[in-house]
């Protein structure tokens, strides 16, 4: 099993003003890896959506929490995990209430809310959502759109 060349983790308070810091960190990592400008913008939008969902929905107004973001830097891809320990939701119920998305519809015809998941799935090569004690969104963007799947992911990477 290949290990990530670099593994970066950051935690921030679940507040909107810290999402920009996560975006800046991501931009630096992706630029260092050689992603194109367009791919970096896609990465930033997807990660911002995941972080914003955690900030807006994970913690009730009277409850404070944090957002954890992990970056797994591989030779051929960047894997990002955004996690919170807040209130969970049923993703399948959420998707049923929103879809189906159709290319014939313009953005203003889509129902409000839930566009974050749609954007993440559109902009990233892989997206997985795990709901347990909180919500964990795992996203992968392959460098140069090449994909060689050997099963190594940030989720099964063990830190020493």
Curated annotation (Swiss-Prot):
Keywords: ATP-binding, Kinase, Nucleotide-binding, Serine/threonine-protein kinase, Transferase
Catalytic activity: L-seryl-[protein] + ATP = O-phospho-L-seryl-[protein] + ADP + H(+); L-threonyl-[protein] + ATP = O-phospho-L-threonyl-[protein] + ADP + H(+)
First-tier enzyme category under EC: transferase
Superkingdom classification of source: Bacteria
EC numbers on record: 2.7.11.1
SUPFAM superfamilies: ATPase domain of HSP90 chaperone/DNA topoisomerase II/histidine kinase (SSF55874)
An MF annotation (GO) of this entry: ATP binding
UniProt cross-references to Pfam families, sorted A to Z: HATPase_c_2
InterPro entries named among the record's database cross-references: Anti-sigma-factor_SerPK, HATPase_C_sf, RsbW
PANTHER family named in the record: ANTI-SIGMA-F FACTOR RSBW-RELATED, SERINE-PROTEIN KINASE RSBW
Function in brief: Negative regulator of sigma-B activity. Phosphorylates and inactivates its specific antagonist protein, RsbV. Upon phosphorylation of RsbV, RsbW is released and binds to sigma-B, thereby blocking its ability to form an RNA polymerase holoenzyme (E-sigma-B).
Family, similarity comment: Belongs to the anti-sigma-factor family.
Official protein name in the record: Serine-protein kinase RsbW
Organism: Bacillus licheniformis
Lineage: Bacteria, Bacillati, Bacillota, Bacilli, Bacillales
Gene: rsbW
């Amino acid at each position: 099993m290949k290990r990530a060349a670099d593994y970066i983790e950051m935690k921030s308070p679940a507040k909107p003003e810290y999402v920009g810091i996560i975006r800046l960190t991501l931009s630096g990592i992706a630029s260092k890896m050689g992603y194109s400008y367009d791919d970096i913008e896609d990465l930033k939008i997807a990660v911002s959506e995941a972080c914003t969902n955690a900030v807006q929905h994970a913690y009730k107004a009277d409850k404070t929490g944090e957002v954890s973001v992990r970056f797994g830097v591989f030779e051929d891809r960047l894997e990002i995990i955004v996690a919170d320990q807040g209130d969970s939701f049923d993703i399948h119920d959420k998707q049923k209430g929103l879809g189906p998305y159709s290319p014939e519809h313009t953005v203003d015809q889509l129902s409000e809310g839930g566009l974050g998941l749609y954007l993440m799935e559109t902009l990233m090569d892989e997206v997985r959502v795990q709901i347990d004690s909180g919500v964990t969104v795992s996203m992968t963007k392959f460098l140069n759109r090449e994909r060689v799947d050997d099963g190594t992911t940030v989720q099964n990477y063990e830190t020493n």
